[in-house]
């Protein structure tokens, strides 16, 4: 009989603990071994129960989820999926949790009929499976992130005038991977369009966080913006992001069409538009993530003459999307996350 994934649910709400536990226990390969109402109880249960994965409420009494997560990752690192409210404060806190080492997050189930219980349970279970299989990432130390920007990312690199456009896709582990990649990108970079699988309530906070850390201007795409050098456009969580041709260059386009590969925004939608309209002037980058979204789109980009890059297995939190792309021949060059910015900038200047 296969060994089940042992999950500890940590949430101050008895109702939420019961609901999450019920959803997880329905999965044939999982079992909830305990449910803790606060950080102190969770700490004791971890010692006794030795769970494989933790689901952790962002906001709890006594010691909040962030403080507990920071201590956990320092003293007893383990895979954690954060459970967050769909608020601006909740999204900012969740992004901080990912920086501290949480593998992924999911919003709390809502009673407004936004999605079915079955759909939510399926996503929760998938994220727990991915978390168990994921590589734990060391949280960043207190060093200045701007100081980590390499010399090649000087304000006057000249790369923005290359006529190239960079397209990036990521999922699980992607918030930190995208940040690390963009820390190596200069202020006058070519335009960059990014799809990160993320709910609507979180993408604006994600873009603001990146903008505060990285040299280029980084915004959440609104649609119909001129695609300009020195600007990075992050897909909003409610729509697909595409590129389209305008009278004087390229524009962003948002499409609230059905999900593709069960995602909206989907990486394949962005990459397909790049292959069709930008062709040899495009550069495609696929980073860490669960599933196969982006693989076919990256292949079409390569077939259209674009340079294509995939994150290697050793540096991925989840080697899913880059693996699928590599297996079908979509990836021209595989490299570590540490090398990605340098390799991509080399392709821009080639």
UniProtKB/Swiss-Prot annotation:
Any Pfam family: CheB_methylest
CheB-type methylesterase domain residues: 159-350
Top-level class of the enzyme under EC nomenclature: hydrolase
Residues the record marks as active site: 171, 197, 293
SMART domains for this protein: REC
One GO term (biological process): chemotaxis
CDD domains: CheB_Rec, REC_CheB-like
Classification via HAMAP family: CheB_chemtxs
Protein task: Involved in chemotaxis. Part of a chemotaxis signal transduction system that modulates chemotaxis in response to various stimuli. Catalyzes the demethylation of specific methylglutamate residues introduced into the chemoreceptors (methyl-accepting chemotaxis proteins or MCP) by CheR. Also mediates the irreversible deamidation of specific glutamine residues to glutamic acid.
Protein name per Swiss-Prot or TrEMBL: Protein-glutamate methylesterase/protein-glutamine glutaminase 1
Species annotation: Dechloromonas aromatica (strain RCB)
Lineage summary: Bacteria, Pseudomonadati, Pseudomonadota, Betaproteobacteria, Rhodocyclales
Gene: cheB1
């Amino acid at each position: 009989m296969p060994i089940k994934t042992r999950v500890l649910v940590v949430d101050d709400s008895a109702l939420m603990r019961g609901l999450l536990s019920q959803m997880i226990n329905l999965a044939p390969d999982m079992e909830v071994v305990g449910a803790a109402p606060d950080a102190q109880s969770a700490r004791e249960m971890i010692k006794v129960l030795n769970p494989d994965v933790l689901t952790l409420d962002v906001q709890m009494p006594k010691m909040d989820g962030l403080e507990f997560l920071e201590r956990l990752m320092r003293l007893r690192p383990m895979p954690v999926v954060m459970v967050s409210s769909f608020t601006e404060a909740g999204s900012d806190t969740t992004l901080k949790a990912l920086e501290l080492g949480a593998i992924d997050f999911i919003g709390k189930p809502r009673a407004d009929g936004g999605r079915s219980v079955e759909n939510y349970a399926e996503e929760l279970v998938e994220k727990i499976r991915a978390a168990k299989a994921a590589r734990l990432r060391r949280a960043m130390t207190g060093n200045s992130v701007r100081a980590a920007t390499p010399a090649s990312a000087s304000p006057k690199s000249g790369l923005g005038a290359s006529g190239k456009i960079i397209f990036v896709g990521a999922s699980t582990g992607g918030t930190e991977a995208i940040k690390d990649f963009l820390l190596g990108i200069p202020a006058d970079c070519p335009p960059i369009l990014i799809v990160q699988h993320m709910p609507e309530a979180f993408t604006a906070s994600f873009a603001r966080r990146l903008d505060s850390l990285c040299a280029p201007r980084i915004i959440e795409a609104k649609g119909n913006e001129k695609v300009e050098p020195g600007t990075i456009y992050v897909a909003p969580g409610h729509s697909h992001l595409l590129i389209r041709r305008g009278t004087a260059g390229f524009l962003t386009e948002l499409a609230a069409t059905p999900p593709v590969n069960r995602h909206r925004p989907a990486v394949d939608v962005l990459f397909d538009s790049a292959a069709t309209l930008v062709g040899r002037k495009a550069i495609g980058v696929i980073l860490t993530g669960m599933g196969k979204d982006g693989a076919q789109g990256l292949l079409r980009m390569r077939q259209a003459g674009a340079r294509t890059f995939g994150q290697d297995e050793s540096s991925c939190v989840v080697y899913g999307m880059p693996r699928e792309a590599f297996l079908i021949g979509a990836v021209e060059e595989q490299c570590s996350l540490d090398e990605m910015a340098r390799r991509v900038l080399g392709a821009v200047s080639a």
